[in-house]
Amino acid sequence: MRLTPKEYRRLSHRRITLLGMSGVGKTFLSNMLRREDWFHYSGDYRIGTRYLSEPILDNIKAQAMQVPFLRTLLRTDSIQIINNITVDNLSPVSSFLGKLGNPERGGLSLTEFKRRQALHHEAEVQAMLDVPDFIQKAEILFGYPHFINDAGGSVSELESPEVMKTLAEHTLIIYIKASEQNERELIARAERDPKPLYYREAFLDEQLTRYMAGRDLEYVAQIDPDDFVRWVFPHLFRARLPRYEAIARDHGYTILSSELAQISSSAEFDVLVEQALAREGAT
């Protein structure tokens, strides 16, 4: 969707997709807008509650079955395990993705890791293709005039023309670009708290080969799961940047995370969007 600042200002229904790395402020902004008549569509929440709900539960049950006491209760239907995924608690999704490496340290085999990556990829594609339906639900069913699509950090990795076409046709795409300070903070955060991530398979294969050669490892089972995530995150971050930039160039607009940090209301966000439209060629 391409708009001039004047056209955006006149919209009675604003529909926006936020893109960017996890930690740049997408969910912070979405939560703020949610309090001011915006419907918050969380891609990760949709993934966890609709498309990966059963695999997530199966994974939890598989872990529980390793505990004799819980195994007996599960096999006799004496207990029930449910997902408690909320927009503010998406831990079950990242826990399902898992980390590659030594099983004694909670790591997954390469085969299992890639299986889960593939499931997540398909789930994210479907969650983004659901956006038009939820735009209608938000307005007709729930009465929200505006819609914010809080897309996952890995949307740039999907390589799905259909997803980009759908988002560009139905929403204004805004890429939140990390400032240099924000970039350092995100990398430092990954060092402190390495979390499961989605990788394109070609990227994973290339970086895994480099990592294992650099650590002089023969088998994936020798990998320290957290060490690999710490090592690979800066490479992933830099690999995603040109992908985000290409999406913004072809389909949307860019704002800086430092600009986003200055706003505290939907009105201020609207001004920021208009500024982005103006500086990127719309008049």
Where are these regions (language model features)?
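ATP-dependent small-molecule kinase phosphotransfer cores
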Residues: 52, 57-162
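NTP-dependent small-molecule kinase module
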Residues: 217-283
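Conserved phosphate-donor/acceptor-positioning beta-strand/loop module used by diverse small-molecule
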Residues: 150-151, 166-219
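The conserved Walker
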Residues: 22
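Short beta-strand-centered segment that lines the nucleotide-binding/catalytic pocket of NTP-utilizing
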Residues: 37-52
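Conserved glycine(s) of the Walker
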Residues: 25
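Hydrophobic positions on the alpha1 helix immediately C-terminal to the Walker A/P-loop
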Residues: 29, 33
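Hydrophobic anchor at the beta1->P-loop junction of P-loop NTPases
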Residues: 18
